[in-house]
């Protein structure tokens, strides 16, 4: 029973549970914090014999507990007596007090967790309830509370991805909800607690409060309090809900959960992603003005500023074709985001008919192109409105990943050789690369400007301090990662004829293209502003035409200093890029003139018989020329131009050891397997071990069959050719099989066209400098017919595609005739490659068919350069 005393009204109010009757068992603390008397009726007797009314305490009263055990029973903030619990009779009634009760009251005012109820079982004090006078902490707003406990901030750096299984996600969610409920109870205690001034100084008890109950007043840290039952229940539920389901990203900047966006990270193109809740990442909440983004393609998470995000509807401005052509992960990301976008917009793309001969990756590529065209057209007919996430996807706890982000066809993208990896490490890559902070490069360059560091000690491409060699073009260092990127991308060109990536870092999305028609280099805005100086990129944009830092008259531009000997350094860079060491090839001494015999040649993937043409030009007698070729047009050209001296044997896969023994022995084996599935320019490439890439192993097989047996010391030579723009891993594998490192030769030194190629072989002097002859046509004008004017001194690499004839960023035709632009004629292309005029003019072939033959052929001056030493070994005319 709770009685009123005549104590002053400013004392603390304390709830008391009356003692049970002798017949009743003592109250036991229940697991949920309720105090229950099993069937017993609690009674209290006043001196006047008045019996109090039965009922519950008023809801606006807040009571303190002095009893330690009862305090533990009330640890969860609930006190729920049974119906037999008596309530105070009348707040105005005064009960007599004795000194013993006064001593009990003083102890209650200083009560802590330590138990005192056993000593004062039958001496309960009744204090006047003053709940209406109490002040609720946090009632004016939690921001003004003295007990603010800001959440610890955990910064997040993009790194290893989080692949969340359903089981693990459920475990995390359950754990976070338990933590939120626990925190909610603490907040409820702190929000509803009543401040009660102390009546007189009291002696503090040596006890500590329970972990779940926070001190309410700095002056009295040991007073353990609990909220009034009904209020605590309501606050518990509300606070738990607010802590667990508090809305995210409510900063008025848009881009809520579930929206499809483009995000920009330094060193990467704009990448598609999806805004997700913080709990999905397993990290802390994103700060105001930032969003958690889950990237398509690799499933990683990053915190990105709102300023670095664009809606997916900005597809035409954010989509980067060069990155799409090069990086398989980017293609996969585009495929996935457009799958989700088409699903939301209700756009259905017709399925491509599949049969046994249709490659799944080609089907995916066709569908992807259809979706990209739809996206570039503005996501019609629904437009950007149709890309908004449905209501269920805005729920942060909705499991949309397994249902919405399925990628059955995306897996058909066979992972080709690793492309440029701009300063970021992923677990999918075979090597773990160094993660460089966004500001590392800027900080190091600043130190160079302050003369605190040597620029040769840092990688000017990415900012790494793990320098392994010098940059071949500019003063500065280069790390191993950027070296591999440079090897892959230095000779990769877009459809406009310019390099696909920055000359310095082999990255960047926004690049400046040189205005010199004979230069094809690009520089990204980031490198220009960082190394040349702030604002240099804008100044270059305003300058028209702008000559880049490789062809400009000056050699120094801020910290960007061009090496004077860069041509030879670039040559040595590709000549000495070998991470594998092999024994030098066997050197054969020259054969005396009287002992020289005609050469016997096995040409695999022969094309239009460039090898035989060069041997004839050099005057070397050819005894036998066996060629493996499957293209009918190429066979026709070879048969007509060489009067049937070539023996065609069909598909290389059908040539056996028996055939080699029958046709041999051979003195020279040459070939260049198709590069379609090796070149990183091809977005659908399959690599060395699939598609046409596997044909390299046919060359390797027949090369070993044709080698001289042990004891046969006759000179034996071989040559294998392929593109420079191949993956580092593919080049490494080819070198490992051939037990030789390649040399890189660019035909621009001896012809009017760029054409960089790798050559493996044991021909003498393959590493010697490439020198032009008097008969080589080094300028495009020398290759043109009368009355035609060349607009460029050299053309870019001519391929099998018709648009490879166009030059420059504006796609100009290379020739000017009759005051009009014109393409190269077939006879002019033949001169560019070094072939005789009308060499491919057989069988009424069209212009495009002739260009396809030339686009797959070798450059005649380059092969002449490689074959020239053979005159010391074989008979000549």
From Swiss-Prot:
Residues 210-225 have a biased composition (Polar residues). Residues 447-579 form the ADD domain. It is found in: Nucleus; Chromosome; Cytoplasm. Coiled coil: none annotated. Residues 1-154, 194-250, 412-431 are annotated as: Disordered. Transmembrane segments: none annotated. Its main location: nucleus. A zinc finger (GATA-type) spans 458-488. S-adenosyl-L-methionine binds at residues 606-610, 629, 651-653, 856-858. Keywords: Chromatin regulator, Chromosome, Cytoplasm, DNA-binding, Metal-binding, Methyltransferase, Nucleus, Repressor, S-adenosyl-L-methionine, Transcription, Transcription regulation, Transferase, Zinc, Zinc-finger. Residues 226-284 form the PWWP domain. Disulfide bonds: none annotated. GO terms for cellular component: cytoplasm; euchromatin; nuclear matrix; nucleus. The active site is at residue 675. It catalyses: a 2'-deoxycytidine in DNA + S-adenosyl-L-methionine = a 5-methyl-2'-deoxycytidine in DNA + S-adenosyl-L-homocysteine + H(+); L-cysteinyl-[protein] + S-adenosyl-L-methionine = S-methyl-L-cysteinyl-[protein] + S-adenosyl-L-homocysteine + H(+). It is an enzyme of class 2 (transferase). One of its GO terms (biological process) is response to fibroblast growth factor. Residues 599-877 form the SAM-dependent MTase C5-type domain. The PWWP domain is essential for targeting to pericentric heterochromatin. Required for genome-wide de novo methylation and is essential for development. DNA methylation is coordinated with methylation of histones. It modifies DNA in a non-processive manner and also methylates non-CpG sites. Acts as a transcriptional corepressor for ZNF238. Can actively repress transcription through the recruitment of HDAC activity. Also has weak auto-methylation activity on some Cys residue in absence of DNA. This is DNA (cytosine-5)-methyltransferase 3A. The lineage of its organism: Eukaryota, Metazoa, Chordata, Craniata, Vertebrata.
């Amino acid at each position: 029973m709770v009685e009123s005393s005549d104590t002053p009204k400013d004392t603390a109010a304390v709830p008391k549970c009356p003692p049970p009757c002798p017949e009743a068992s003592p109250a036991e603390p229940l697991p949920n914090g309720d105090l229950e008397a099993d069937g017993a009726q609690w009674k209290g007797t006043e001196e006047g014999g008045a019996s109090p009314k039965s009922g519950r305490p008023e809801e606006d009263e807040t009571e303190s507990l002095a009893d330690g055990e009862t305090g533990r029973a009330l640890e969860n903030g609930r006190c729920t007596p049974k119906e037999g619990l008596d309530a105070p009779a009348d707040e105005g009634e005064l009960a007599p007090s004795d000194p013993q009760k006064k001593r009990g009251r003083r102890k209650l005012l200083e009560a802590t967790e330590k138990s005192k109820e056993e000593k004062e079982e039958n001496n309960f004090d009744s204090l006047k309830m003053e709940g209406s006078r109490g002040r609720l902490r946090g009632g004016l707003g939690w921001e003004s509370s003295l007990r603010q406990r800001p959440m610890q901030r955990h910064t997040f750096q993009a790194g290893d991805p989080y692949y969340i299984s359903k089981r693990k996600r459920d475990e995390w969610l359950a754990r976070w909800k338990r933590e939120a409920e626990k925190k909610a109870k603490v907040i409820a205690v702190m929000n509803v607690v009543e401040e009660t001034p102390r009546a007189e100084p009291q002696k503090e008890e040596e006890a500590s409060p329970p972990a779940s109950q926070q001190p309410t007043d700095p002056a009295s840290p040991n007073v353990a309090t609990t909220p009034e039952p009904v209020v605590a229940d309501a606050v518990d539920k509300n606070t738990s809900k607010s802590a667990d389901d508090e809305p995210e990203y409510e900063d008025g900047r848009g881009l809520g959960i579930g929206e499809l966006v483009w995000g920009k990270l330094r060193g990467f193109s704009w990448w598609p992603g999806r805004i997700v809740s913080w709990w999905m990442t397993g990290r802390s909440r994103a700060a105001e003005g930032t969003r958690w983004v889950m990237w398509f393609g690799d499933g990683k998470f990053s915190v990105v500023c709102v300023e670095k995000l664009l809606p997916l509807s900005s597809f035409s401005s954010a989509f980067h074709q060069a990155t799409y052509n090069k990086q398989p992960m980017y293609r996969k990301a585009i495929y996935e985001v457009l799958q989700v976008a088409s699903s939301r917009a209700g756009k259905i793309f017709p399925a491509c008919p599949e049969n046994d001969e249709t490659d799944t990756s080609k089907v995916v590529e066709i569908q992807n192109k259809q979706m990209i065209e739809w996206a570039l057209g503005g996501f019609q007919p629904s437009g950007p409105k149709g890309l908004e996430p449905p209501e269920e996807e805005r729920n942060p706890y909705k499991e949309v990943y397994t249902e919405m982000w399925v990628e059955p066809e995306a897996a058909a993208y066979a992972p080709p050789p690793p492309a440029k990896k701009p300063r970021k490490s992923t677990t999918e890559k075979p090597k773990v690369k160094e993660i460089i902070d966004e500001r590392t490069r800027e900080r190091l360059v600043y130190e160079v400007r302050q003369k605190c560091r040597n620029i040769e000690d840092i990688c000017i491409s990415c900012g790494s301090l793990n320098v392994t060699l010098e940059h071949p073009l500019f003063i500065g260092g280069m790390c191993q990662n950027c070296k591999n990127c440079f090897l892959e991308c230095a000779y990769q060109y877009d459809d406009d004829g310019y390099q696909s990536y920055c000359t310095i870092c082999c990255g960047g999305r926004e690049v400046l293209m040189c205005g010199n028609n004979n230069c094809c280099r690009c520089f990204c805005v980031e490198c220009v502003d960082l190394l040349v100086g702030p604002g240099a990129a804008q100044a270059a944009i305003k300058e028209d035409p702008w000559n880049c830092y490789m062809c400009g008259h000056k050699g120094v531009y801020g910290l960007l200093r061009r090496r004077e000997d860069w041509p030879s350094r670039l040559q040595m860079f590709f000549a000495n890029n070998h991470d594998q060491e092999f024994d030098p090839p066997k050197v054969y001494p020259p054969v005396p003139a009287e002992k020289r015999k005609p050469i016997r040649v096995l040409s695999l993937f022969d094309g239009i018989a460039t090898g035989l043409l060069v041997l004839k030009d050099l005057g070397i007698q050819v005894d036998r020329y066996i060629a493996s070729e499957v293209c009918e047009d190429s066979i026709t050209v070879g048969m007509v131009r060489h009067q049937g001296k070539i023996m065609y044997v069909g598909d290389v896969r059908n040539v056996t050891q028996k055939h080699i023994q029958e046709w041999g022995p051979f003195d020279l084996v040459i070939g260049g397997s198709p590069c379609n599935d090796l070149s990183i320019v091809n977005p659908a490439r399959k690599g060395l071990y699939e598609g046409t890439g596997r044909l390299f192993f046919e060359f390797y097989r027949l090369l070993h069959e044709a080698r001289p047996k042990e004891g046969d010391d006759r000179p034996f030579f071989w040559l294998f050719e392929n593109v420079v723009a191949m993956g580092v891993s593919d080049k490494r594998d080819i070198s490992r099989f051939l037990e030789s490192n390649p040399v890189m030769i660019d035909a621009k030194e001896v012809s009017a066209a760029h054409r960089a190629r790798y050559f493996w072989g044991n021909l003498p002097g393959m590493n010697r400098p490439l020198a032009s002859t008097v008969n080589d046509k080094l300028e495009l004008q020398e290759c043109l017919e009368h009355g035609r004017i060349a607009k460029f001194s050299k053309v870019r690499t001519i391929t099998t595609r018709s648009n490879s004839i166009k030059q420059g960023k504006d796609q100009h035709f290379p020739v000017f005739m009759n005051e009009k632009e014109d393409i190269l004629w077939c006879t002019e292309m033949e001169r560019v490659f070094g072939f005789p005029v009308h060499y491919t003019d057989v069988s009424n072939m069209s212009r495009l068919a002739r260009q396809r033959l030339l686009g797959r052929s070798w450059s005649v001056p380059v092969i002449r350069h490689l074959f020239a030493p053979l005159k010391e070994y074989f008979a000549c005319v």
